[in-house]
A protein has these predicted regions:
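Mature catalytic domains of secreted/periplasmic carbohydrate-active enzymes
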Residues: 20-437
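Bacterial Sec-dependent N-terminal signal peptides
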Residues: 1-21
């Protein structure tokens, strides 16, 4: 007989039947709170309904597509001629079919990258598809993707770069904020339900650049008003950047974190006081919680490209990540308490390249084969554990197991700090694995 035993270490032992107070998205510790009091409150910090729905998606797709697709650049300078944008075979349904078959839950399009070129016929600038020969200036990539997502049942998100190298008003404070919010408003009112709004933190500000103070309060309020079910990512306050673009989450990845959203006033002071930033290894340990005055439910998103570049480059057609590499990324992202945002850039034709489509099919087949057959009896039942508890599960006879999946009910907060897995075989228990956060 083979059995599996799971031992869990939890943030607090107060998991009985008594009523508990939960803190949604943010908790401020009272003055003089002890470490144990902070840990107890941390264990009752929970996601908003929007954050919960987002975390349950697990696997989403980035679509870097725009004027850079035709210039061969990664960062455009805003001086591009819109006449070069002409994806004569553009087929958003081809994109979305591939994503649906690949197990993706959402597609996020770069509606405007740093070059300022807009993939929809905006009223704010001439640097858009309306000035291109594609469909005689009557095309709308955002709308076509929106319709394809509706048809095939994928959620829809938009990337809108705050940094704009084309807009003349960039760097003029309120003038640009008004311009940016007008673009945002167009995207959030003309394209149905939007599930994620992605704000890149990249910019070229410095000695030779323009300094723009973004009105994040007004920007986030606009989203809450127009798309209340959407999460805001990176420079938003619902979803944080994992801290690298290599596809690797932390082995200990906290959703309940001392990292204040960067768009909040005073965030720089908090980072300095705690000695942390988005790339820090530790964002939620007991030691860090003891020093913090606030905690935020701020889960991690791992963004990585299937190719060396974010935009399509023909010379990279044979440099698509291997299946083994993508499997490792999957385990190091989804398997490390993060949502995986895998970039698959459409090519100049307006199609997903055959090599990319082939590879994502291989990945989804691997994932399905790995997790389709649950070999543990009653393994999908919820177990409410206390500190140090163990639980035994029977594994079906004559089966081999090489992957162990454990999940946590985060509607009650993030409480698991550590777990071990042992297997009973040949008359003895054998340690086969261990981990920290789930």
């Amino acid at each position: 007989m083979r059995k599996t035993i799971l031992t869990a270490a939890l943030l607090c032992a107060f998991l009985g039947t008594q009523a508990q107070e939960y803190y949604e998205k943010h908790v401020a510790f009272p003055a003089g709170a002890t470490t144990e009091q902070k840990i107890d409150m941390a264990s009752r910090l929970v996601p908003t309904p929007q954050q919960l729905a987002w975390q349950q998606m697990e696997f989403t797709c980035f679509l870097h597509f725009g004027i850079n697709t035709f210039t061969g650049r990664e960062w455009g300078d805003g001086k591009e001629d819109p006449a070069i944008f002409n994806p004569t075979e553009l087929d958003c349904e081809q994109w979305v079919r591939a994503l649906k078959e690949g197990g993706f839950k959402m597609a996020i399009i770069t509606a405007k990258h740093h070059d300022g070129f807009c993939l929809w016929p905006t009223r704010t600038t001439k640097h858009s598809v309306a000035s291109s020969p594609w469909k005689n200036g009557k095309g709308d990539v955002v709308q076509e993707l929106r319709k394809a997502c509706d048809k095939y049942g994928l959620k829809f998100g938009v990337y809108l770069s705050p940094w704009d190298r084309n807009a003349e008003c960039y760097g003029q404070g309120e003038a640009y904020n008004k311009f940016f919010i007008e673009q945002l408003t167009e995207l959030l009112t003309n394209y149905g339900e939007v599930h994620e709004v992605w704000f890149d933190g990249a910019n070229g500000e410095g000695p030779n650049g323009k300094k723009q103070e973004y009105d994040w309060d007004a920007i986030l309020k606009t989203i809450r008003r127009l798309q209340p079910k959407a999460v805001t990512a990176i420079m938003g306050d619902d979803v944080r950047w994992v801290g690298n673009e290599g596809g690797l989450g932390r082995t200990t990845e906290w959703s309940a974190t001392a990292l204040m959203p960067n768009s909040y006033p005073g965030s720089d002071e908090v980072y300095k006081r705690l000695g942390i930033n988005a790339m820090s290894k530790d964002l939620g340990s007991r030691e860090l919680v003891s020093k913090a005055s606030d905690l935020f439910w701020y889960p991690s998103e791992v963004d990585v490209s299937i190719r060396p570049g974010w935009f399509y480059h023909a010379e990279q057609d044979n440099q698509v990540r291997s299946l083994a590499n993508l499997v490792n990324i999957y385990y190091r992202s989804v398997g490390c308490n993060s949502v995986l945002l895998l970039n698959i850039p459409p090519d100049k034709r307006g199609l997903m390249h055959e090599n990319d489509v082939k590879r994502i099919k291989e990945l989804t087949e691997y994932i399905k084969k790995t997790f389709a057959d649950n070999k543990v009896e009653k393994g999908n039942r919820i177990w409410t554990a206390k500190v140090g508890d163990t639980k035994e599960y029977k594994v079906r006879k004559n089966t081999l197991v090489n992957t162990f999946l454990i999940q946590e009910d985060i509607t009650k907060g993030q409480r698991v700090e550590g777990f071990t897995v042992e297997v009973f075989a040949n008359g003895a228990w054998h340690h086969v694995g261990e981990g920290t956060t789930v």
